[in-house]
Amino acid sequence: MPNNIVVYDLLISCPSDVSEYVDILEKEVNHFNNFWGRTNNVIIRTRHWSKDSYSEFGSYPQKLLNKQIVDSSDMAIGVFWTRFGSPTENYGSGTEEEIERMISMNKQVFLYFLDKPISPSKIDHTQYEKIKQFMEEHKNKGIYFTIQDERTLAKKFRENLELYFDSIIRGTEFKKSSVKKE
């Protein structure tokens, strides 16, 4: 018998130093879909520039990505480690622009910062300082998590997905539009 299934698009946003984590996040989404999602008639589709964008001209690249995949996504996950990313026309990086756009549209953003060891010679300190500044700017604007490794990221992300969608199913989702601005 056919089911009515609600499909959500999840934007995966991250600089190049965490691109290997995209596969981990996609596996967690598949796990979520196969168990929690199937039971609750919810499916999440991942979107990432490397597989969901196409060649196009007429504007700067991030603006085209925003049009192609960012603005139509229902939620996003952002992951940072040691690189903040390449600047765009309006932001310090494409990842920052994507996260800020999603927040400004009152869309769900899952945000994680990796705190895993790396050789000091491999760190671009200017990039890392931008991450620390971004964390500082967002510490009183919402909840993010600092995690130590791939396994912890996978576990925490899956837990967050389940908690978030459980709040939607139960009708207790935090209503961003009802927050008073001071």
Where is each model-derived feature located?
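Conserved catalytic or regulatory cores that recognize and/or transform ribose-phosphate-containing ligands
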Residues: 1-182
